[in-house]
Amino acid sequence: MKKIYLTLGAVAVLSCTALFFVQAETRTEIREEAKASETKQFQANGKVLVAYFTWPEPDGVDASSGASRIIADGKLYGNTEYVARMISEATGGDLFAIKTERTYPTPHKALIDDAKKEAEANERPKLTTHITNLSDYDVIFVGYPNWWYDMPMAIYTFFDEYDFSGKTVIPFVTHGGSSFSQSVETIAGMEKDAKVIKGPSIPARSVPDAKNSIVNWLQQQGLINK
């Protein structure tokens, strides 16, 4: 009798196990189909805009906080601009430089000290460049360096100026070790009706060799084909 009970029990366990794997496999297929559907929808969206704020620093890279400059093809670029160009090239997106009326110091320490004062005063520097055809874009990358554990105040001005409701906003950052800090959460709070996705975070020292990691990230998001 015990053998019968044991056999029946084993059958029940095997049945439950088989049912579990069938259900798990079904759920996996559903998730994969949903992911594929989302990817196709993402790829089918309209044009991509790659907006960026950058400030090249001719005094080189500081080991602790990462000054933002790179020289390529005989030209001086801010790190963020260089990354923006990589994203634009990979996605076919239009480039847009966020520029301010005021100028910033170029030595790194003076720049960071100035950025700290600007942030503490909650200043909104005036912009000299403006997007006139925002409705043409569904996906907007927004790049910036991490200045004093936050995005530059010019980026606050940028998000104050535009309504990104219904659009996908992808922040990306260059930094000396602090990554995004809390800036992505700040952007999500400022643009409550936009879909905000955390984009690439590139350490200053890694910018020259960042192309492969950026392309891989774009592929994973379905923004470019593999």
Identify the meaning behind each predicted range.
Residues 14-22:
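Hydrophobic alpha-helical membrane-insertion segments, chiefly the h-region
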Residues 6-14:
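Sec-dependent N-terminal signal peptides
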Residues 195-226:
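Glycine-rich phosphate/pyrophosphate-binding loop and the adjoining helix
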Residues 25-137, 219-226:
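N-terminal beta1-alpha1-beta2 submodule of the flavodoxin-like/Rossmannoid cofactor-binding fold
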